[in-house]
Amino acid sequence: MAAAMAEQEGSKGSARNRGGVQRVEGKLRASVEKGDYYEAHQMYRTLFFRYMSQSKHIEARELMYSGALLFFSHSQQNSAADLSMLVLESLEKHEVKVTEELLENLAKLFSLMDPNSPERVAFVSRALKWSSGGSGKFGHQKLHQFLAITLWKEQNYYESRYHFLHSSDGEGCANMLVEYSSTRGYRSEVDMFVAQAVLQFLCLKNKTSASVVFTTYTQKHPSIERGPPFVQPLLNFIWFLLLAVEGGKLTVFTVLCEQYQPSLKRDPMYNEYLDRIGQLFFGLPPKQSSSYGGLLGNLLNSLMGSGEDDDVEDGQEDSSPIELD
């Protein structure tokens, strides 16, 4: 009986709090609609810190989120970006569990920010760090997918590609690469767009996405004749490589790399990626010294990460940032 009464009182208190927040939101919205942007912005900040000090983290976060959307709708980029950062602050300090709804909200804020603003860079960095849940991995795959799609819509293919590589959306990545290659690439390099993506997915131990991106890209690209086999030797190599990875036979992998050296020499990074793939899927030992030092070595290390734990689910290992060359 007592427990039921306490629960009922708690529900009433929660309803009162929500009603109070809605009234405050109404007043703030009216200020923004009148064009009192500065005053409204300062009031949002004051309420945020008040709610946070009272441990009303959810109310604080929801108020900042709705406020940011409101400022974005009135083209007040600076105020909107500031409130977006406060949304992140509430998530960081409250140690909130990562949910798809929260990731969608963060992606929504990201999509509304000025693509060229430094605030957007800072926002996405913090959002990815929070979404990793303290695991040390570089962001939640779903958030990377949302970001990749937004950047693709903005025709920022370079950055979109980076985030697709850290997602599990091989099909989306392939469709983006088809558009990227068709609008920005040379016809003679249609095979290289997908080859690099497949090799990098494999270096991240994401066999599933590597296979999906290859199949989807080769089926949908208007300049690629239906295969296999393909007209382009590099595409045949990638096709055989994916089969070899599934089979796990070192001799097949070794012969394959030897036979296709002319195609692999088109990009100096291919053999570096294949060295790592040999370690991950065929039991080859790491090379004592890389044939590429300096910048290329650093690019490869950042792609592959330093993790050596092979008992990891597909696509979940080596989630450190990928430098795209």
From Swiss-Prot:
Main location, first listed in the record: cytoplasm
Domain of life: Eukaryota
GO BP annotations listed: protein insertion into ER membrane; tail-anchored membrane protein insertion into ER membrane
Subcellular location: Cytoplasm, Cytosol
Ranges annotated as biased composition (Acidic residues): 307-317
A GO CC term attached to the entry: cytosol
Keyword Cytoplasm carried by entry: yes
Region named Disordered: 1-22, 306-325
UniProtKB keywords: Cytoplasm, Transport
InterPro entries per UniProt: GET4, TPR-like_helical_dom_sf
Signal peptide span: none
Reported function: As part of a cytosolic protein quality control complex, the bag6/bat3 complex, maintains misfolded and hydrophobic patches-containing proteins in a soluble state and participates in their proper delivery to the endoplasmic reticulum or alternatively can promote their sorting to the proteasome where they undergo degradation. The bag6/bat3 complex is involved in the post-translational delivery of tail-anchored/type II transmembrane proteins to the endoplasmic reticulum membrane.
Recorded family membership: Belongs to the GET4 family.
Quaternary assembly: Component of the bag6/bat3 complex.
Protein's name in the database: Golgi to ER traffic protein 4 homolog A
Gene that encodes the chain: get4-a
